Each structure stands twice: as C-alpha cells, then as structure tokens.
Amino acid sequence: MMQNYNYKYYEPLEQMIAVRHQYMSKIIKKITNLNIYEYLKNKKILDIGCGTGEFLKNYHDLNNQCLGIDIQHNFKFKNKIGFTLKNTDFKNFIKNNKKKFDIIFIFEFLEHLSFSDREFLFKNLFKLLNRNSLIFISTLNKNMISKFLAIDVAEKYLKLLPKNTHDDKYFLKPSEIQNLANNNKLHLIDVSGMTYNPLFKSFKLSKIDLVNYFISLRN
C-alpha cells in the first residue's frame, strides 16, 4: 500500500483523470474510428511517471496489461497479474527493459526532466513501441502565464503543490516536443490545451494551450 506522504499533493493530478480519458477518447476515435473501450482491450500499456497508479489502474480494469514506473514509491495498489507498479528511475527501466508496448502515457512528467534526460527518453521511446502504437503526453507550456499560474499561484498561493515542485526553465513549448518526436521517428497526431477550474477542482479540454496541454504521437 501507499507509504507515508501528503496525499493532498496528488489531488491535482488525480483531478486530471477524467480529462486525460476524454482526450485519449478523442484521439482514438479520430485515428481508429473506435471508441476507447473497443480499442483498449488486451493492450500493453506503460505509464512513465505513474504517481500513485490511480490512472493506470482504470485501464487494467479494462483487461489490459499495465506497467507503471515512478521514482517515488507512493503507490496506492499492490501488484497482481497484469498490473505492475515499479519503483525505478526511467533511465534504468529503459536500459533493462525488453518489453514492447501498444500505448505509453507520459503525463505531467517531461517538465521535471533535464534537457539531456528528455533527449534520452525520446531517443529510446521508439524502441519501446509495437507497430501502430500511441503515446499520450501532458505537460506545461513555456511562457510567463504558465510560470505565474503553475508556480506563483498553484505552489505559493493556493499551495496545491509543494514549493519548488516546478522549475519553469524545464517547461516545454509544444514545438519542442514536436521537434523531439520528429528527430526520433515519431509523428505528431494532435495538440490540445486544457484549462483548470479551481471552484469545481476540474480540468476540461480547451483550444487554449498557454498553460497545460496534451500532445499525442504515433510511430
């Protein structure tokens, strides 16, 4: 079960569960003409930076084989057949991994990586993928508005996250992810923004990608 940590700091991430699912549904429908429940059957799914494992667990319940990795050991669930959460660094995982996946989640993770770690990840993503696989990413845009809302408001004023969770020098513009993808045999499907409503503690898809946004890729 979970080890000791302040659960409130995972709440903003778990408030994203519905909008992540909504975004994935939109993309899967766009490229396969299937709904997400038809498509997500017997798939092999990797969640890089899986947090508590809450989001990934939903897709194991749809009869997929799910593996989540995170450098922190704050998992909510015990491992069982078809569902594994590993406390490991993503570099070590990639170096030792022999499996391939149909879907990879990289949610709220890239903005915590150095530039060299980011390049390492993208250089190796292609090796992790089966044919016709999908990658779903969410992260923070790089601009003054994003810095103000994600750091000054969320961390310092509202205290939704611990101070120093983010460093805006690691925030990424969508074009930066697209360049990393293009340089590593991956192709852009879509970029969509999402906005947060603090009154309802919920996110929704938006045409505005100034702060949070999704990107989907394929090989």
Annotate each predicted stretch with a short phrase.
Residues Y5-Y7, A154-K163:
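Short glycine/proline- and charge-enriched loop/turn segments
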Residues F136-L158:
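Conserved class I S-adenosyl-L-methionine
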Residues C66, I135-F136:
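A short hydrophobic/small-residue beta-strand
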Residues E119-R131:
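A short glycine-rich, Lys/Arg-flanked "PGG" loop and its adjoining helix->strand segment in the class I
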Residues E108-H112:
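Short catalytic micro-motifs in class I SAM-dependent methyltransferases
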Residues K159-E176:
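Acceptor-substrate binding/catalytic loop of class I
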Residues M1-N97, I103, F107, E119-F122, ...:
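Conserved N-terminal segment of class I S-adenosyl-L-methionine
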Residues N179-N182, H187-N219:
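A C-terminal cap/extension of S-adenosyl-L-methionine-dependent methyltransferases
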